[in-house]
């Protein structure tokens, strides 16, 4: 997805000692405190905008394949969409070859177009856009795919205050700390999640989507 960004502070962590207590505890094997956002059988709690046919449930996964569309998590009451501020999100993801998708955080439902609020965590292991899976689009650019196509991998996103931490298969890719004074709508605030169907040539699967609210 193409849009402009203005950012100037990224912390890349080779050894995430400072995250050991915080993120390490949150990724405990028992998943205590996590709530499931996807029931594995339907799109209940989710709302697609333009081109809703780009979404289906297949073999226990949400599959995006078709023209541009975004699937917003709204929760049990679409009139009052669910909202998250500090959280730890986990999802299992599988990309097909040359597929592009994304996971939006702190966003808001809208009828069409690229989401105007929040950040996009890129999902792309081999498509023409060189910005690969895990990148915070137009903010933190990762050019080495951390996972392979046609293989399930675990994507984790944690937001605490102004810090965004992304992991793939248990490995910390980076911590981004948003600078003070950011204006506009592409910033951390609060909001919901959205999945992206990028284009008709892209197919990506999502399953076991769950979140834990953090203080």
PLM features per residue range, with description:
Residues 2-15:
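Bacterial N-terminal signal peptides that target proteins for export
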Residues 14-24:
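Bacterial N-terminal signal peptides
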Residues 27-215:
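Carbohydrate-interacting regions of secretory-pathway proteins
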């Amino acid at each position: 997805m193409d849009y402009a960004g203005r950012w100037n502070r990224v912390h890349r962590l080779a050894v995430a000692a400072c995250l050991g207590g915080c993120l390490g505890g949150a990724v405990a094997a028992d998943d205590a405190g996590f709530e499931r956002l996807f029931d594995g059988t339907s799109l209940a709690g989710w709302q697609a905008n333009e081109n809703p046919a780009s979404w289906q449930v297949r073999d226990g996964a949400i599959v995006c394949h078709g023209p541009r569309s975004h699937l917003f998590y709204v929760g049990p009451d679409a009139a009052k969409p669910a909202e998250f501020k500090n959280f730890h999100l986990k999802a299992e993801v599988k990309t097909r070859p040359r597929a592009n998708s994304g996971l939006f955080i702190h966003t808001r439902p809208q009828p069409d177009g690229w989401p105007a609020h929040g950040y996009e965590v890129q999902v792309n292991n081999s498509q023409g856009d060189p910005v690969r899976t895990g990148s915070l689009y137009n903010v933190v650019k990762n050019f080495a795919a951390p996972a392979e196509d046609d293989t399930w991998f675990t994507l984790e996103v944690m937001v605490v205050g102004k810090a965004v931490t992304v992991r793939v298969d248990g490995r910390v890719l980076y911590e981004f700390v948003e600078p003070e004074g950011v204006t506009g709508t592409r910033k951390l605030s609060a909001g919901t999640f959205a999945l992206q169907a990028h284009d008709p040539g892209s197919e990506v699967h999502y399953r076991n989507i769950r979140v834990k609210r953090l203080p």
